[in-house]
Amino acid sequence: MKTFLKPILSLSLFGLLLLIYACPKHNTWDYEEGHFSTTPVNLYFLNTQYDDYNSALNQSGETFGLCFSSNRNSAGSDFDIVYKFVNILYDWETKDLYIGTPKYAGSNLEIESNSLHNAMLKINTNSDEFGPFMLPLGTKESTNNQNWGIYYANVFLFSNDENGNQDIRFVENQDQEDYNDAKPIKFLNTSFDDAYPSFNQEDSGMYFCSNRAGSFDIYFAKVDFTGHDWPAIFSDTTQKSIQKMDSLSSDSADKCPFIIGNTMIFASNRPGGFGGYDLYYSKFKNGKWSKPINFGSKINTSSDEYRPVIRREEGFDNDFMIFSSNRSGGKGGFDLYYVGVEKVPW
């Protein structure tokens, strides 16, 4: 496995699609809101003694899928992208918060699981897969009677080093139930390592990290995504304007950008942190990114913290962030943790 990825977390978090499209984004709650711990909590039910990191996420719903990179399948060798389902339940009367595996599995969960399983068959190889990011395309009619006549269409982005360096690739099932074979996004990739794509809220481009200029920095590719014809856009080989984001990058390694709303979160081992890789955030305002701010000692440690992703959660007074860390007290290697953070504006 390539040295730059040894400690990397790759998370992808997404809500069950029926919940995404059925639930309003802004609710008025007639009861007390829930609260996520502002001290990191180990997600023991997801972790193993191996390295578990790198996730991706989408919004809404109390049950959601979490895709992340793990070397559990190879007993510590190469990394694959795996998925688990997470259930968040808050009892407004008892104030009990449950975060764990789903207590009940219905047809929606089974259909989503089938879709994820089929995607992983196309994504995973004998090389290392990292940095999953999922774009949901909604439900479509299925010819498979086992899926109640529907299937979930998605585009999955990830990186893979089967050519010797990390390249960003994608699989999709926009027009057919089975996912296509993985294809490279040629306008992003170089002979260096390119990974961890994320998109701005204006649909005007995507951010990613690369060591094409030496150390890892954060880059922006100007691409028009307003039509949301993702497979066609990612298959385009036309050269794009790509620039290093000096306001976000440092002389050290800056990796794993993830954007939600006007906020970018990422990992960096720049000076001034608490040791190893720390988590930082930046706000986009008046056409530019603010100076990155360290999340502080309540989240960061002298060990490594990697690949943060945030999920908005209605009915709570803060948002839900998942990240990876090799801090002491876990199951071994890198574990996944969650922590409550200040709500990100819509």
Where are these regions (language model features)?
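C-terminal motif of bacterial Sec signal peptides marking the signal peptidase cleavage site
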Residues: 19-22
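Short, conserved micro-motifs composed of acidic
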Residues: 24-346
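N-terminal hydrophobic targeting signals that begin at the initiator methionine
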Residues: 1-2, 336
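Bacterial N-terminal signal peptides that target proteins for export
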Residues: 2-12
